[in-house]
Design a protein with these regions (language model features):
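Catalytic cysteine-centered active loop of the rhodanese-like fold, especially the PTP/DSP P-loop
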Residues: 70-110
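Active-site-adjacent beta-strand anchor residues
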Residues: 38, 55, 87
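Short, charged, surface-exposed secondary-structure boundary motifs
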Residues: 64-70
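Short glycine-enriched, charge-decorated loop/helix-capping segments at active-site entrances
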Residues: 52-53, 71
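Thiol-based oxidoreductase modules, predominantly thioredoxin-like and allied folds used
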Residues: 55-58, 62
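Alpha-helical elements of the RecA-like P-loop NTPase motor core of helicases
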Residues: 46, 64, 95-96
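Flexible, polar/low-complexity N-terminal or interdomain linker segments that lie immediately upstream
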Residues: 1-52
């Protein structure tokens, strides 16, 4: 069995998505041009805090909550016409999540 490493998956994702820095993400968010999505787990939010007015969608639920045809879709939670800016603690999970949403058809900025 040949298993890809998580680092390989992240490296591949980073080749397919656009990344921006924190200042660029906050500028887009403050100008109301994107949905700022925190994909960290609840325990991380409790420990490290959160960006005010950002949307919290845990990584494990992201695709389910954003699938309009799925039973877990969170209608009205996000403006589905805006770009999705995802962030986590270190950028690895958000890279994989951005790639997944890109595959679903979303316009993504990490």
């Amino acid at each position: 069995m040949n298993i890809k490493s998580s680092q390989t998956l992240v490296s591949e994702a980073l080749k397919e998505i656009k990344t921006i820095n924190t200042d660029e993400a906050l500028t887009l968010f403050n100008e109301d041009k994107c949905n700022l999505i925190d994909i960290r787990e609840k325990g991380e939010l409790d420990k490290m805090g959160r960006v005010e007015n950002s949307n919290h969608i845990p990584r494990g639920m992201l695709e389910f909550w954003l699938d309009p045809d799925g039973p877990y879709f969170k209608s009205g939670k996000l403006d589905m016409n805006k770009e999705m800016v995802l962030f986590c603690a270190g950028g690895l999970r958000s890279a994989l999540a951005a790639r997944s949403l890109k595959e679903m058809g979303f316009e993504i900025i990490k």
